[in-house]
A protein has these predicted regions:
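A sequence/structural signal for flexible, mid-protein segments enriched
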Residues: 1-339
């Protein structure tokens, strides 16, 4: 899970960060909420996680989904269509929090938007300008990802869109384990390096064509097959306004779990008004997904991850066991993997 970077933009005052989302997908309903307390220290913030709160997502029928604290985030996952917590179209949802110190926080209810399917997405070879340790700039090979999508629903209603990209790649290790032998791992990692991407319709634009979502440097991750999964979220106008402000302030990529680079007003407040500074946003979305493959040939046949280019590699590394390459490494081949 992403960490909070509070060094971006202006330091925030002491307060609380409550950020998260509810995703009503085709297979599962997922909820995640970050809850942290901020302390000013000189010219920066020091976040402290709040780990023993009661966190619930509530729908407009009064049904509640309780979130449990795991690995830094309050989380819950239930099967889609679970009658104990309905996620029907046009229902509204908000988060309610009660800390161990009896501090209560609540978000403004958000109506669940309809799914908005992208028209298509592409991957194109290009270059990316990077800065080395000496401060000199040079161009390196990269893949640029672009998406096309409507910005209005079929009935003409405006749609506001947010994207999250996740990179998937294949890697073969050089294991000498006589039990497992050489393994092929499938690994995913959050796409790094671009700002928050949110788009809404203008008076004369109802379709977005070849909109750039960012560039990814070509490395060994493209040597055996690579997919970029694009999660498109149709969000409310209010959520769009919030993330649009965050995007204009942030100098690097922010995830939904990162505080804005300044005091951007979100939709969460202290229930009794005792805490003035509450930062973050809780939004709801019904996501759609599109995966963009890149073959090794399309990426220029980059060098594979193994063997490591060092004389003294650590005793256990991605080449002795590809499962240690990431917390998300798996030997299970995704059903959609075609390489």
């Amino acid at each position: 899970m992403d960490t909070i970077d509070l060094t971006q933009g202006l330091p925030l005052p002491d307060g609380i960060v409550v950020s998260g989302r509810l995703l009503a997908g085709e297979e599962f309903t997922d909820a995640e909420v970050l809850l942290e307390e901020l302390f000013r220290f000189e010219d920066s913030n020091r976040p402290a996680q709040i780990v023993s709160a009661d966190v619930r997502v509530v729908n407009s029928d009064g049904q509640e989904l309780k979130l449990l604290y795991r690995e830094g985030i309050y989380r819950a996952r239930i099967p889609a269509g679970d009658p104990a917590f309905r996620t029907d179209d046009d229902m509204s949802f908000n988060v309610k929090i009660l800390t161990r110190d009896s501090l209560a926080f609540v978000s403004t209810p958000e109506i669940l938007p309809l799914t908005l399917e992208a028209s298509g997405a592409t991957a194109t070879a290009t270059t990316l300008t990077i800065e080395n340790q000496a401060g000199a700039q040079n161009d390196v090979s990269a893949i640029e990802y672009r998406i096309s999508t409507p910005l209005r629903y079929a009935n003409g209603e405006a749609a506001y869109v947010r994207w999250l990209l996740t990179e998937f790649y294949q890697q073969t290790d050089m294991s000498t384990d006589t039990t497992t032998g050489i393994k092929v791992c499938y690994i995913d990692a959050s796409f790094e390096g671009n700002k928050v991407k949110v788009v809404g319709p203008s008076s004369n634009v109802s379709e977005l064509t070849d909109f750039s979502l960012g560039k990814n440097r070509i490395t060994f991750r493209y040597a055996e097959g690579n997919y970029m999964e694009i999660r498109q979220e149709a969000i409310s106008r209010e959520a769009f306004d919030y993330y649009d402000q965050v995007s204009s302030i942030a100098s690097t990529e922010l995830s939904i779990f990162e505080a804005p680079g300044g005091p951007v007003v979100g939709n969460v407040k202290s229930e009794d008004g005792s805490i003035a500074n509450v930062f973050g946003y809780f939004y709801v979305a019904r996501p759609s997904y599109i995966r963009v493959p890149v073959t090794p040939a399309q990426a220029g046949n980059p060098t594979a991850a193994c063997p490591l280019a060092t004389d003294r590699p650590p005793p256990i590394n991605r080449c002795t066991d590809c499962l240690v390459a990431s917390n998300n490494s798996t030997l299970v081949r995704p059903s959609w993997w075609e390489f």
